[in-house]
Amino acid sequence: MTSADSLLFTSLGPSPSSGDGDCKFNEEFKFILLPLSYAVVFVLGLALNAPTLWLFLFRLRPWDATATYMFHLALSDTLYVLSLPTLVYYYAARNHWPFGTGFCKFVRFLFYWNLYCSVLFLTCISVHRYMGICHPLRAIRWGRPRFAGLLCLGVWLVVAGCLVPNLFFVTTNANGTTILCHDTTLPEEFDHYVYFSSTIMVLLFGFPFLITLVCYGLMARRLYRPLPGAGQSSSRLRSLRTIAVVLTVFAVCFVPFHITRTIYYLARLLNAECRVLNIVNVVYKVTRPLASANSCLDPVLYLFTGDKYRNQLQQLCRGSTPKRRTTASSLALVTLHEESISRWADIHQDSIFPAYEGDRL
């Protein structure tokens, strides 16, 4: 067994008080799965998000509120994928980290920063869509781009502030020539880390996920009401696609990771037997790449829900000169025909929902 393998229990196994000090994790799969999966996420994530950022910055301005959320979502994904080459090297080198303790802390911090910023930006999009479909008058007041920009800034700062303790928990540990970059913390601090991590999970994933489910449930009920007109059917279809894409990202990327991580932490805290710990550890490690894959799935949201974004991207891929800047409007609204609402909307021409027609990016 190599020195890295002998250290696996130190970073991943139960705390010393568990009495299972002889439990060794068989993690050979990790040294193949994680480098390959992170490399794929890096290539695809950069290829998908870099053009997205370029289009938002140079071809789809001025932004509406939803485009603002999507730009920040793409920015978060891009920053994360740029850190992945170091993790590819780390796991390919069998848990050897030569980049220093500070960069170890930064890379682990960046993983959760991207994860929870993505969750909150998707939640912002969900609430914004819910307001536009179910409460259009309120959406005009609260859905302005300036408000969305301030909210995005708040998301960045709040998530970063909540994750500051992670910078103290995460560290490196040397054993001979092998240096581990812990994804949690040292064994003696693991109990405290679990309490911190669980609190963060409830605040930055549990509540936002619940809000997203409620918003999309109410939206789906509203959208399935029969409305005359082909244009409205097209708007409803785009909105339903939005629901499907966002819930798919949650179901594939976020939910499995948080469930398996919670089980993994509980198994260690409850001093589960070694066989159970090994099974839980394998399942948890398999879901880590899924959490990273949100950087590749998020751009699907822009493609499925925005006609103008899709057209601009097609022109970019064909090498043709894109049309001059157009207003970015990422998601469609259901057309509302109430005369009083239309008159009210005409007064607010600077709103992001002009005349309540279906917005198309």
From Swiss-Prot:
InterPro entries: GPCR_Rhodpsn, GPCR_Rhodpsn_7TM, P2Y4. Signal peptide: none annotated. One of its GO terms (biological process) is cellular response to prostaglandin E stimulus. It is a multi-pass membrane protein. One of its GO terms (molecular function) is G protein-coupled UTP receptor activity. It comes from the Eukaryota. Receptor for ATP and UTP coupled to G-proteins that activate a phosphatidylinositol-calcium second messenger system. Belongs to the G-protein coupled receptor 1 family. This is P2Y purinoceptor 4. It comes from Mus musculus (Mouse).
